[in-house]
């Protein structure tokens, strides 16, 4: 996978709205939707958002989320965590992943 490089937070916010917001929230105390709330995800292990029902695959992967691991995951979620229930095909363009992860790193703090 490509090394993560800081991208455009503004473009990342737009990508989040069009590709992620239907299933995820980012704000502290935000609700779980089809997917978990992402607040505080960086530095946390996969499958650990309190109150969200994960697949065994997400729990067993036990990856610690960082800009790099998130970028790798978003390239092809089902390949990175076989058995994940995330029904998103991934972001194939490295630039899109960099922009989205740059946005997420700030929006989920």
Swiss-Prot record:
Q: Where does heme c bind?
A: 20, 23-24, 86
Could you tell me the keywords of this UniProt record? Electron transport, Heme, Iron, Metal-binding, Methylation, Mitochondrion, Respiratory chain, Transport
Residues with the modification N6,N6-dimethyllysine, per the entry, are 61
Q: Which Gene3D superfamilies match?
A: Cytochrome c-like domain
> What are the N6-methyllysine sites (modified residues) in this protein?
61
| Subcellular localization(s) per the UniProt record | Mitochondrion intermembrane space
Q: GO terms for molecular function, please?
A: electron transfer activity; heme binding; metal ion binding
Say if the entry is tagged with keyword Transferase: no
> What does the PTM comment state?
Binds 1 heme c group covalently per subunit.
Its main localization is mitochondrion
> So which domain of life are we looking at?
Eukaryota
Q: Which residues carry this modification: N6,N6,N6-trimethyllysine?
A: 78-79
What is the similarity comment for this entry? Belongs to the cytochrome c family.
Q: Which PANTHER family match?
A: CYTOCHROME C
Describe the task this protein carries out. Electron carrier protein. The oxidized form of the cytochrome c heme group can accept an electron from the heme group of the cytochrome c1 subunit of cytochrome reductase. Cytochrome c then transfers this electron to the cytochrome oxidase complex, the final protein carrier in the mitochondrial electron-transport chain.
The protein's name: Cytochrome c
């Amino acid at each position: 996978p490509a090394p993560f490089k800081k991208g455009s937070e503004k473009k990342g916010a737009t990508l989040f709205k069009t590709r992620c917001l239907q299933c995820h929230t980012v704000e502290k105390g935000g609700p779980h939707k089809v997917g978990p709330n992402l607040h505080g995800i960086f530095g946390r292990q996969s499958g650990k958002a309190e109150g969200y029902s994960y697949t065994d695959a997400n729990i067993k992967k036990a990856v610690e989320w960082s800009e790099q691991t998130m970028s790798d995951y978003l390239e092809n979620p089902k390949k990175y965590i076989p058995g994940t229930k995330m029904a998103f095909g991934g972001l194939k363009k490295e630039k899109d992943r960099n922009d989205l992860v740059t946005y997420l790193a700030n929006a989920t703090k």
